[in-house]
Amino acid sequence: TLEGFEEVVCIERKKSVEEIANNVGKEKKRFDAEMERINEYTFKYIICEFSMDDIINYPRCIFSENMWHTKPEFCEREIAKRKITGKYILRALMEYQTWYGIHILFCDNAKNAKKVTESIFKRLNTMFHEQT
């Protein structure tokens, strides 16, 4: 969080597409309540440590190319267990973005997500200190 501005800034980090699939799937009611709570903040972000490609290709993306090559039957069985599709995840995220004004940023990995988060904090810190 940004010291002194915890009341106006909220950054929610998501480590994997599986995490967000769980949030908008099995835990949707809880996650919707969390989005309602986040809506009270002036500046709100969901920082994703994965790509838009991961969302679009979910659930196929959860297995590496090597895994698909060496154990295709296993991959297919595991994917068949999933009830959530990438299309559904994308729809849910775009609804949160549209309805609650939450900025959703796809950063590809944890390192990039950290850099993006730091950059957001720097911009907000500059803005807040110019206003005081």
Residue ranges, per PLM feature:
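Conserved catalytic cores of phosphodiester-cleaving nucleases, focusing on short active-site segments
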Residues: V9-K15
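Non-catalytic C-terminal interaction segments of nucleic acid-processing enzymes
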Residues: T1-E7, E19-T132
